[in-house]
């Protein structure tokens, strides 16, 4: 997809754009259905010839289909105009007034061979005189100053007859979100010169290898599950890119990316893809692949002609896109193709899925990295960069390895279910012929591609992907840090809690010992008082027994007195008094010893 520049001018609240028609390429295109394409071209020529004069009709009949073959996208500050084979981009410092845009008239000047579009702009205000993302005309100043500087550049360009001078001056390119652009092709009308009749824009764009193919696809060979564009000839390359970007944004999974961000989730028994070392200098071709290569080379009906620099750039970008998908599959399968290899090599390549055209290496890398973190099993940004490094090594000196892998991919597409033969027909076979031709793709040219790709890799970062990867990683890091704080807090509190539990156990053990000691002392005291009680009871019983004996003795004394024996009674009384006093003295001594023992026990208990 070629890029062109637009000359513009502001007049009050309107912006006039001058878009040159792209030159006719010398390279002929292949038509999937030549009869249908010829009929469409002849009908367009007849319609144009009815309105224009005979001389003008003869001059423009062959190119009227190319004049009408346009696709237009517009936003508040941006306009994308795809004319036949070339994309023109314009960023306005003024805001376009799209509220009442129902029909946009496009004038084509057959003499000067350019399109002219006039768009209304919103009035300038004090606070909104510059468009977002920078000013194409001035850079950094106020809106009036930027307008004066832009007018000065336009005056110089008009004086020197260089309408693209203002666009070629160094300015900061604004960041445009292409998926937000609105397609207004159906609202546009084309007017040739000053004729009153207007025409609708048509859609008949090229696709495939170097955009050489046109017409409808053979749907029987199309894998609808992988290929998202079934009518590439009806969609311009910018529309195909927009479809791809929107699909990737819908299918991108934040959680899946988080899972593979810190460490790849490699199944057990498989090698980590980041540790794989491809052997690009050790390759061999099977007999079946050699036979396939021979047949593909014989299918070439005409010699490879040197194409212009724009087509060459598109071919090289397509080759790099195919190679990146192959490198990912080889690295993730350890160069042992699986049943999913055909799907992997097709889903990671926008050429197969959307028939997309690339004109610079940066877009190729960004598209591959976006799809790599969206669709396959391993979705890791660093893994994608490693695949790019593998592709660089292949371009440096792995031509045989590349041819072998292209043939293997051809076999996988042909034998897959559903069939992916359309990818072989429109891309792979032409690229196999291109790589195997030393005149079309020399070793020096491949080394130049490797150097350019290496330089671009250093400039591409995660912000270029446009999927919020940096924000997702920051969010994940915060979550991991929060979990680490929680784990550290739980681990820090558990030893303290364990130490506290040990102290509590020690206290419980000490209190238990104290309880046991107290219980022993209490038992000693209780036993002492129990023994004292028993002794007192014994003393009382002895006293009772003595009283009974005294009563009996009194009775006997009475009998003796009756007999007149008084001396013996006195002697017995003295003996009883002596025995009772001795008994009382011994009992008191025993009681005192028990009390002393109790007091000693209490003293010992209080001391402990």
Swiss-Prot record:
Bias kind Polar residues: ranges: 588-608
Biased composition (Acidic residues): 502-524, 543-579
Any single GO CC term annotated in Swiss-Prot or TrEMBL for this entry: nucleoplasm
Any one Gene Ontology BP term: box H/ACA snoRNP assembly
Entry superkingdom: Eukaryota
GO MF, one example: unfolded protein binding
Region (Disordered): 487-531, 543-608
One protein family per Pfam: SHQ1
UniProt feature, compositional bias: Low complexity: 489-498
Its job: Required for the quantitative accumulation of H/ACA ribonucleoproteins (RNPs).
Family statement drawn from the similarity comment of this UniProt entry: Belongs to the SHQ1 family.
Protein name: Protein SHQ1 homolog
Organism expressing this protein natively: Drosophila melanogaster (Fruit fly)
Taxonomic placement: Eukaryota, Metazoa, Ecdysozoa, Arthropoda, Hexapoda
């Amino acid at each position: 997809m070629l890029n062109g520049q637009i000359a513009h001018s502001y007049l009050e609240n309107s912006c006039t754009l001058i878009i040159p028609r792209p030159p006719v390429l010398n390279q002929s295109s292949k038509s999937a259905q030549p009869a249908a394409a010829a009929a469409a071209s002849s009908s367009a020529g007849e319609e144009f010839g009815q309105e224009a004069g005979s001389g003008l009709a003869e001059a423009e009949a062959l190119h009227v289909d190319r004049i009408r073959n346009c696709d237009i996208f517009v936003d508040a500050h941006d306009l994308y105009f795809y004319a036949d084979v070339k994309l023109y981009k314009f960023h306005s410092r003024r805001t376009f007034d799209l509220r009442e845009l129902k029909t946009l008239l496009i004038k084509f000047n057959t003499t000067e061979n350019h399109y002219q579009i006039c768009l209304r702009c919103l009035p300038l205000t004090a606070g909104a005189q510059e468009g977002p993302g920078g000013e194409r005309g001035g850079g950094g100043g106020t809106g009036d100053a930027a307008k004066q500087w832009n007018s000065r550049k336009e005056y110089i360009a008009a004086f020197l007859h260089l309408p693209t001078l203002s666009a070629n001056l160094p300015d900061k390119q604004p960041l445009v979100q292409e998926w937000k652009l609105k397609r207004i092709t159906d609202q546009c009308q084309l007017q040739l010169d000053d004729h009153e009749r207007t025409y609708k824009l048509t859609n008949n764009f090229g696709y495939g290898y170097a955009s050489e193919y046109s017409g409808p696809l053979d749907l029987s060979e199309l894998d609808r599950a992988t290929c998202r564009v079934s009518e590439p000839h009806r969609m311009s390359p910018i529309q195909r890119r927009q479809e791809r970007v929107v699909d990737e944004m819908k299918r991108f999974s934040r959680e899946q990316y988080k899972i593979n961000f810190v460490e790849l989730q490699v199944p057990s028994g498989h090698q980590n893809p980041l540790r794989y070392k491809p052997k690009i200098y050790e390759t061999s071709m099977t007999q079946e692949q050699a036979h396939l290569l021979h047949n593909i080379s014989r299918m070439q009906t005409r010699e490879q002609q040197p194409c212009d620099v724009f087509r060459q750039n598109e071919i090289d970008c397509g080759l790099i896109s195919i190679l990146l998908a192959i490198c990912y599959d080889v690295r993730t399968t350890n160069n042992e193709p699986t049943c999913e290899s055909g799907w992997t090599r097709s889903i990671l390549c926008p050429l197969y899925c959307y028939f997309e055209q690339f004109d610079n290496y940066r877009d190729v890398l960004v598209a591959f990295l976006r799809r790599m973190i969206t669709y396959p099993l391993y979705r890791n940004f660093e893994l994608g960069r490693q695949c790019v490094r593998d592709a660089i090594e292949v371009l440096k000196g792995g031509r045989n390895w590349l041819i072998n892998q292209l043939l293997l991919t051809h076999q996988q597409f042909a034998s897959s279910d559903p069939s992916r033969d359309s990818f072989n027909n429109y891309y792979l076979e032409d690229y196999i012929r291109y790589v195997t031709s030393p005149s079309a793709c020399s070793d020096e040219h491949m080394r130049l591609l490797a150097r350019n790709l290496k330089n671009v890799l250093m400039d591409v970062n995660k912000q270029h992907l446009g999927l919020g990867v940096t924000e997702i990683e920051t969010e994940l890091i915060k979550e991991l840090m929060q979990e680490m704080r929680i784990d550290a807090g739980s681990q820090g509190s558990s030893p303290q809690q364990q130490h506290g539990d040990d102290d509590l156990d020690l206290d419980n053990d000490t209190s238990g010992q104290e309880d046991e000691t107290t219980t022993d002392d209490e038992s000693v005291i209780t036993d002492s008082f129990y023994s004292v009680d028993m002794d007192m009871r014994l003393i009382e019983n002895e006293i009772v027994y003595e009283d009974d004996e005294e009563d009996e003795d009194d009775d006997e004394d009475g009998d003796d007195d009756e007999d007149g024996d008084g001396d013996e009674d006195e002697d017995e009384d003295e003996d009883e008094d002596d025995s009772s006093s001795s008994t009382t003295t011994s009992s008191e001594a025993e009681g005192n010893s028990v009390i002393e023992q109790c007091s000693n026990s209490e003293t010992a208990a209080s001391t402990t």
